[in-house]
């Protein structure tokens, strides 16, 4: 174990511990909170989507939670608010640096459950349940790492391909006309866009003025926009452009939306599918998401899984 003291560094992050054996982490008392930096949906450390998880061992206001999320500036930061399970799960809140609190998000759910299981429950739990604003979300230990169950999908409005082409700098003919561009939510909404080629996926570039005009026309679409292309052999490539003009390297919530979309439009010609999504390659943070989805007479199963790695832990003042 190597411990790095950062006392002279002008930051509220210090005494960061890099440790490959994290089965136990002793909670510190007093005014400090334990924090963990987690790479989610990653095949190894320094890939996937970064997450800051804090264990709130003291009262912490909404204002302070928002300030911490802005300080670390990851796409999301989570706060574990209960020392033990309350109503069958752990109370958790999810914050973004710019949008504020969100009711649900995929990689924060997975990463927070990973921290609870390995650092506070001793690594023995088969399921960790999180009480989120959207409701209780179970996260299970599976052969794919950690797997969360998402809500049944809701389907909203359809968007014209030419509008998406203008906003994201791609040709209208690169969007697959066989399937709609559609708003979907399994807990946190996204607009799902089917593409014809990996080349088109790589060419996406968000046009801020065009996006702002687009949102004026479609305020319900102020959300993630998930682009995907079929790579064959039960594998999709995807990119997710967020509403604050940032690309997300791994988006569990939007991939749950995508799973519902694929079943609704019979994309794989099956109502019980398993496939893998590769996201984040174009930004150097390769992420791997394992999806299982099924639908039978209105009974939906949406499961999104992947591996998580704790890369740092320490105290937050």
Q: What residue spans do the PLM features occupy?
A:
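Extreme N-terminal basic, low-complexity initiation segments
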Residues: 2-7
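Short, Lys/Arg-enriched N-terminal segments with co-localized hydrophobic residues
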Residues: 8-32
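Active-site proximal loop and beta-alpha junction motif in alpha/beta enzyme cores
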Residues: 15, 29-104, 110-317
């Amino acid at each position: 174990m190597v411990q790095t003291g950062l006392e002279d560094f002008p930051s509220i992050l210090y005494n960061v511990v890099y440790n490959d054996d994290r089965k136990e982490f002793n909670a510190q008392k007093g005014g400090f909170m334990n924090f963990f930096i987690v790479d989610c949906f990653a095949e190894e450390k320094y890939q996937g989507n970064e997450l800051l998880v804090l264990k709130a061992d003291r009262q912490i206001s909404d204002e302070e939670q928002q300030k911490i999320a802005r300080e670390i500036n990851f796409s999301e930061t989570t706060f574990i608010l209960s020392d033990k399970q309350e109503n069958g799960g752990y109370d958790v809140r999810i914050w973004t640096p710019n949008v504020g609190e969100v009711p649900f998000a995929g990689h924060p759910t997975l990463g927070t459950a990973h921290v609870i299981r390995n650092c506070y429950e001793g690594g023995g739990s088969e399921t960790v349940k999180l009480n989120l604003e959207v409701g209780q979300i179970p996260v299970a230990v599976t052969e794919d790492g950690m797997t969360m169950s998402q809500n049944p999908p809701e389907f909203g409005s359809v968007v014209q391909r030419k509008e998406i082409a203008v906003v994201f700098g791609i040709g209208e003919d690169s969007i697959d006309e066989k399937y709609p561009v559609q708003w979907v939510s399994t807990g946190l909404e996204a607009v799902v866009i089917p593409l014809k080629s990996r080349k088109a996926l790589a060419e996406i570039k968000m046009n801020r003025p065009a996006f702002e005009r687009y949102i004026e026309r479609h305020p319900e679409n102020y959300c993630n926009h998930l682009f995907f292309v079929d790579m064959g052999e039960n594998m999709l490539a995807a990119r997710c452009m967020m509403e604050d003009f940032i690309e997300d390297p791994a988006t569990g919530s939007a991939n749950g939306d995508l799973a519902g979309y694929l079943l609704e439009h019979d994309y794989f010609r099956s109502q019980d599918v398993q496939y893998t999504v590769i996201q984040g390659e174009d930004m150097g943070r390769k992420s791997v998401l394992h999806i299982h989805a099924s639908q039978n007479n209105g009974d939906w199963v949406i499961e999104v899984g992947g591996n998580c790695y704790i890369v740092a832990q320490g105290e937050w003042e």
